[in-house]
Regions:
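A sequence/structural signal for flexible, mid-protein segments enriched
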Residues: 1-184
Length: 184
């Protein structure tokens, strides 16, 4: 999938804030799986909420035929991270001078499954709810150790096509936000 644009938009909270989203149309043909990565100011985002995956632009589950449409808002806007200060006040996700680079990786359905299972293993709420959670375990892999079967392997091998595009929140981008009234 090719990214058409990465845009900054006027945020709602806090006042005067900026959010971001990318625009891309999902490839023709059902069952396409994607992994979206983002880099803010050149740094790969690796938090729990940064494992962004979807099938067919996020508009379908496996088996449904929804094809060739733009990525849905929850997917294309997931590159905006919300945070708060020590007093609980929301901070603007982006400030003037920030850059955002987005990559779309076309992955196999097996890699999609691996990423989602990994996210479940990583995102553990703790406390009483752990009694009812899926037990911790290594996520099944497609890697195999041939010389020492006692050596555990974690990870997943996948080759994919990748397309990336970025933007910087500079004076020109702020003018475009105002000119085109870009909002969420």
């Amino acid at each position: 999938s090719v990214i058409d644009s990465v845009n900054f938009v006027r945020g709602q909270v806090p006042e005067g804030s900026f959010y971001a989203e990318f625009w891309s149309r999902e490839e023709e043909g059902p069952g396409d799986a994607y992994w979206i990565k983002s880099y803010i100011n050149g740094e790969l985002q690796t938090g729990l909420q940064d494992i962004i995956t979807c099938i067919d632009a996020g508009a379908s589950s496996e088996g449904a035929i929804i094809d060739g449409i733009p990525f849905i808002p929850p997917i294309r806007r997931a590159v905006t991270k919300f945070d708060s200060d020590d007093d609980g006040n929301f901070l603007s996700p982006f400030v003037k001078g920030d850059s955002l680079y987005v990559e779309i990786h076309s992955v196999s359905l097996e890699a999609f499954d691996f990423l989602n299972k990994t996210a479940i293993q990583i995102n553990r709420p703790g406390g009483f709810s752990e009694l009812f959670a899926v037990s911790l375990s290594n996520v099944p892999t497609n890697l195999l150790v041939t010389n020492d079967q006692n050596y555990p392997v974690v990870g997943f091998f996948n080759v994919s096509s990748v397309h990336g595009l970025g933007n910087t929140l500079d004076d020109d981008e702020i003018r475009k936000i105002e000119l085109y009234n870009r909002e969420w």
